[in-house]
């Protein structure tokens, strides 16, 4: 019992992770590593759309084809759909099972491989799946208790993270709307023309050329850029005679300007 309690405390310590620790490209790598070390298995977390949020492999079990899923950070649609249909923890699925994470071509190499899938949901919202697997050792009741706890803890963390992201998105959109509202009619035309010159979210432009093309003064473009830059929406850098380098920091500006029909 004391051993189980110690492992449980290690898992619940995940909740103490700060927001900054969840900003990485794979924010749950550290969590899956911790879980894999505690339960002695391979582990990964995917969201409900199949995006890989984190993984850690203690043991070699997959082929190059499957490891490509981890490199591209997205799981196949059919596997994700199957995982989303699992509403309670499915334990010790054999390699022959459709939801086994062991690929068909490696099942002869790992005939005793076992997969366990635990749904991650909070307040009725399906957020993803926690998947763990071993080459040849059954997941016992103690392991499954820890998996249930881990899926709940990760679910709470995911929900909190999503709420924080939603709040950030709202703040970003509000900042864009307020900045655009400060622009004059001519400045809005200038911003629309500038955004059209970019290659994606960044590019090089020459203010005088744009000004001549749309029939405004260069100072209008300069003022518009200053307003957007002071609002943190863009950043710019003079290239001297070559023009100005511009990078969009908040991409909502494209949609906001388009809505104004400029």
From Swiss-Prot:
Gene3D superfamilies given in the database record: 3.30.450.40, Winged helix-like DNA-binding domain superfamily/Winged helix DNA-binding domain
DNA-binding region: 207-226
A GO molecular-function annotation: DNA-binding transcription factor activity
InterPro entries registered for this protein in UniProt: ArsR-like_HTH, CodY, GAF-like_dom_sf, GTP_trans_reg_CodY_C, Transc_reg_CodY_N, WH-like_DNA-bd_sf, WH_DNA-bd_sf
One Pfam family recorded for the sequence: CodY
Gene Ontology BP terms: negative regulation of DNA-templated transcription
Family annotation (CDD domains): HTH_ARSR
CC annotations in GO: cytoplasm
Top-rank lineage group of the source organism: Bacteria
UniProt keyword annotations, A-Z: Cytoplasm, DNA-binding, Repressor, Transcription, Transcription regulation
Subcellular location: Cytoplasm
Residues covered by region (GAF domain): 1-159
Stated family: Belongs to the CodY family.
PANTHER family: GLOBAL TRANSCRIPTIONAL REGULATOR CODY, GTP-SENSING TRANSCRIPTIONAL PLEIOTROPIC REPRESSOR CODY
Function, in words: DNA-binding global transcriptional regulator which is involved in the adaptive response to starvation and acts by directly or indirectly controlling the expression of numerous genes in response to nutrient availability. During rapid exponential growth, CodY is highly active and represses genes whose products allow adaptation to nutrient depletion.
Protein name: Global transcriptional regulator CodY
Encoding gene (name): codY
């Amino acid at each position: 019992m004391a051993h189980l309690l110690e492992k449980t405390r290690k898992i619940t310590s995940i909740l103490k992770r700060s927001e900054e620790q969840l900003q990485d490209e794979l924010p749950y790598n550290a969590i899956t590593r911790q879980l894999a070390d505690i339960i002695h298995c391979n582990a990964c977390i995917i969201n409900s759309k199949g995006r890989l949020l984190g993984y850690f492999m203690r043991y070699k079990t997959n082929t190059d084809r499957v490891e490509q899923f981890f490199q591209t950070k997205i799981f196949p649609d059919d596997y994700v759909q199957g995982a989303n249909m699992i509403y309670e923890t499915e334990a010790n699925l054999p390699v022959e099972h459709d939801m086994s994470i062991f690929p068909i071509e490696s099942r002869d190499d790992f005939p005793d491989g076992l997969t366990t899938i635990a749904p991650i949901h909070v307040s009725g919202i399906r957020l993803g799946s926690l998947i763990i697997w071993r080459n040849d050792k059954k997941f016992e009741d103690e392991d499954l208790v820890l998996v249930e706890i881990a899926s709940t803890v990760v679910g709470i963390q995911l929900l909190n993270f999503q709420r924080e992201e939603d709040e950030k998105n709202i703040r970003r959109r509000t900042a864009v709307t307020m900045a655009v509202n400060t622009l004059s009619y001519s400045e809005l035309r200038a911003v629309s023309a500038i955004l059209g010159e970019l290659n994606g979210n960044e590019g090089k432009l020459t203010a005088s050329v744009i000004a001549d093309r749309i029939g405004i003064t260069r100072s209008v473009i300069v003022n518009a850029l200053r307003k957007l830059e002071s609002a943190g929406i863009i950043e710019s850098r003079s290239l001297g005679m070559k023009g100005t380098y511009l990078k969009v920091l908040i991409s909502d500006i494209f949609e906001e300007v388009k809505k104004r029909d400029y």
